[in-house]
Structure formats: structure tokens, C-alpha cells
């Protein structure tokens, strides 16, 4: 029993940073600051933003995905997987951080900032694929991706419930503020987990990635 508990403890210590990174990724779904979010779309429409303008913003967001796929390999090559992922995530969050304050006078800055943030979001999405490939053993990747997807749905459900509680266009700035708070927490969680992964000194009994399943 003692050796089994030791094995579980070693496994938890080894996998904890990756769990934190997956949790950070999932937190990104706890936000309405997106060019395709229905709550944000309804708010922008209530503020007089035309359907054509919203369509243009969504098209720009789609094109930003191409830029994100160009950006991530360069960040990864220059900084490394975890530092590059952290940079992409923080740039995404910093682009959206001013949104709640700007809503007091116009919805236009929100459209601009959301569009500017998209390449970094796409880059971070690709970064998480790299993280799972590099830090999770092949036999566990499917389970890890599945658990991450479930967590994403739970955070999306949480922001939807908050949107119901804060319904009405006059309360959208508060909802945007909560979204920025969730994004900031995501970036902090990822950075802390990446730092833990980098600084964690592998003891003599550390479990190599390829041997997780034997613990």
C-alpha cells in the first residue's frame, strides 16, 4: 500500500503542472469577449452595430486564425513551447483587458480589440496541442484532451449562467469585466504551471513522461 501511495504521489507531482495548464486553457471559455459569442452579439446589436459590421469582424477573426498558425511556430522556435505559449496567452489577455472600460462610451473599441486578440488566441490554441504532445504520454493524450474538453464546457456553462444573472445590455460591462477576470486568472494559472514545470527539479525517483502509465 505504501509503494502504491508513493507511486500516486509521484504521478500527481509530475502531472500537476500539465493539469494546471489544461485548466488555464479551459478558463478561456469563461468569457463573452468573442466575435461569435451570442451574448456579445446581442449586446452589440442593441448598441446599433449593424449585421454587416459584425460579419466583417467575424471574417477578420477567421483570417486571424491564419496569422495565428503562422505566429505560433515562430514563437515556439524562438522562445520554446512553454514560454512561447505564455507570451501568446498574455498578449491575448492584454488585448481584451481594456474592453470593459471602453464600453462606457462606445462598442467600437471592443470590436477592434477582439479582432486584434484573435491571432494570439489561435496561437495559444496551437500551443496547447504542443504542450499535450510534449508533456503527456501518448497513451494518455486522448484522456487528457477529453477531460480538457469537459472542463471547457463547464466554464462555458458558468459564463452562460452568469449571463442569465446579468441579463440586459446595461449589465454587459459587468459581464465583460467578469470575463476579463477569468482570462487574467487563466493567464496567471498557466504562467504559474509553466514555471512549476520548468523549475521542478526532477528527483531521482521522478517519473519520466513515457512511464506515467507504469506508476
Predicted regions mapped to residue ranges:
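Short amphipathic helix-loop junctions that connect adjacent transmembrane helices
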Residues: 37-54
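Intrinsic disorder in cytosolic terminal tails and internal cytosolic loops
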Residues: 195-215
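Alpha-helical transmembrane segments of multi-pass secondary-active solute transporters
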Residues: 54, 84-85, 144, 174-179
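Substrate-agnostic recognition of the 12-TM MFS/MFS-like secondary transporter fold
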Residues: 1, 26-38, 57-76, 88, ...
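A membrane-interface helix-boundary motif in multi-pass transporters
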Residues: 163-187
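Juxtamembrane intracellular "pre-TM" segments in multi-pass secondary transporters
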Residues: 1-24, 46, 212-215
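Cytoplasmic membrane-interface "Motif A"-like loop-to-helix N-cap segments
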Residues: 77-92, 173
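C-terminal ends and interior cores of transmembrane alpha-helices
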Residues: 90-105
Amino acid at each position: 500500500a505504501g509503494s502504491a501511495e508513493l507511486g500516486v504521489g509521484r504521478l500527481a507531482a509530475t502531472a500537476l503542472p500539465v493539469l494546471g495548464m489544461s485548466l488555464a486553457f479551459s478558463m478561456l471559455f469563461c468569457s463573452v469577449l468573442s466575435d461569435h459569442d451570442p451574448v456579445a452579439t446581442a449586446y452589440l446589436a442593441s448598441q446599433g452595430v449593424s449585421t454587416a459590421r459584425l460579419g466583417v469582424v467575424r471574417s477578420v477573426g477567421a483570417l486571424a486564425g491564419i496569422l495565428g498558425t503562422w505566429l505560433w511556430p515562430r514563437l515556439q522556435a524562438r522562445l520554446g513551447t512553454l514560454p512561447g505559449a505564455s507570451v501568446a496567452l498574455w498578449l491575448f489577455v492584454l488585448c481584451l483587458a481594456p474592453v470593459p472600460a471602453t464600453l462606457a462610451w462606445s462598442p467600437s473599441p471592443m470590436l477592434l480589440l477582439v479582432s486584434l486578440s484573435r491571432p494570439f488566441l489561435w496561437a495559444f490554441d496551437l500551443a496547447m496541442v504542443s504542450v499535450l504532445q510534449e508533456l503527456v504520454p501518448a497513451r494518455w493524450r486522448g484522456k487528457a484532451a477529453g477531460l480538457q474538453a469537459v472542463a471547457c464546457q463547464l466554464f462555458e456553462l458558468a459564463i452562460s449562467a452568469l449571463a442569465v444573472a446579468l441579463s440586459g445590455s446595461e449589465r454587459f460591462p459587468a459581464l465583460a469585466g467578469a470575463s476579463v477576470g477569468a482570462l487574467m486568472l487563466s493567464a496567471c494559472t498557466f504562467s504559474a504551471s509553466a514555471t512549476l514545470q520548468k523549475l521542478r527539479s526532477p528527483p531521482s525517483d521522478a517519473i519520466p513522461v513515457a512511464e506515467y502509465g507504469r506508476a
